[in-house]
């Protein structure tokens, strides 16, 4: 979460190519790498990998497009973790929110950050509908999938891709 907070502070500056922004993002990426090397990743990365392989979509862009949708999908399996994500993203008053409210606030904050830095909101310009089944099977078979907090299936992953088109 520390890296998420740094990203929120510095990502907008990094997109504008400021030295402080680039330095802050480098630190945030380093801290995030230490975190996910201990706990694994999930279907956000599993779904992003075949987009890079099939369409040459940059991995970070693919992750940013997919993340809010997968956050919504995973929400029932996350306990109170989204409260801390919302706080790290600058959402105030999370202590006075219901679980549903802070989960939505966390997802909305991630979407807003992506929008602010010019990340596309969906996969319409990237994914061909006829490739969805292949993408879903590839994501399901990906080494990152077992780290997802919620069990999933090929059909559910395919539906997540379709919801982004």
What is each of the regions a protein language model found here?
Residues 50-89:
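Catalytic phosphate/nucleotide-handling subdomain of diverse soluble enzymes
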Residues 12-24, 83-90, 94-101:
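C-terminal helix-coil-helix/basic helical segment that borders enzyme active sites and/or dimer interfaces
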Residues 82, 92-165:
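C-terminal charged capping/lid subdomain of soluble metabolic enzymes
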Residues 8, 29-33, 47, 51, ...:
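Buried hydrophobic packing segments
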Residues 24-27, 46-49, 65, 84, ...:
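Amphipathic alpha-helical interaction segments
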Residues 11-47:
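Oxyanion-binding "anion nests"
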Residues 1-10:
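Single conserved hydrophobic/aromatic residue that forms the stacking wall/gate
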């Amino acid at each position: 979460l520390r890296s998420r907070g740094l990203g929120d502070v510095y990502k907008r500056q990094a997109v504008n190519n400021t030295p402080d922004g680039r330095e802050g993002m480098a630190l945030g990426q380093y801290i995030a790498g230490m975190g996910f090397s201990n706990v694994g990743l999930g279907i956000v990365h599993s779904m992003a990998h075949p987009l890079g392989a099939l369409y040459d979509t940059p991995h970070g862009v693919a992750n940013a497009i997919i993340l809010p949708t997968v956050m919504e999908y995973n929400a029932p399996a996350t306990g109170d973790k989204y409260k801390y994500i919302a706080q790290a993203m600058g959402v105030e008053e999370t202590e006075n929110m219901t679980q549903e409210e802070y989960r939505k606030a966390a997802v909305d904050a991630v979407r807003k950050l992506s929008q602010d830095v010019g990340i596309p909101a969906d996969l319409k310009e990237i994914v061909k509908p006829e490739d969805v089944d292949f993408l879903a099977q590839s994501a399901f078979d990906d080494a990152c999938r077992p780290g997802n907090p919620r069990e999933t299936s090929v059909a559910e992953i395919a539906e997540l891709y379709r919801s982004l088109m």
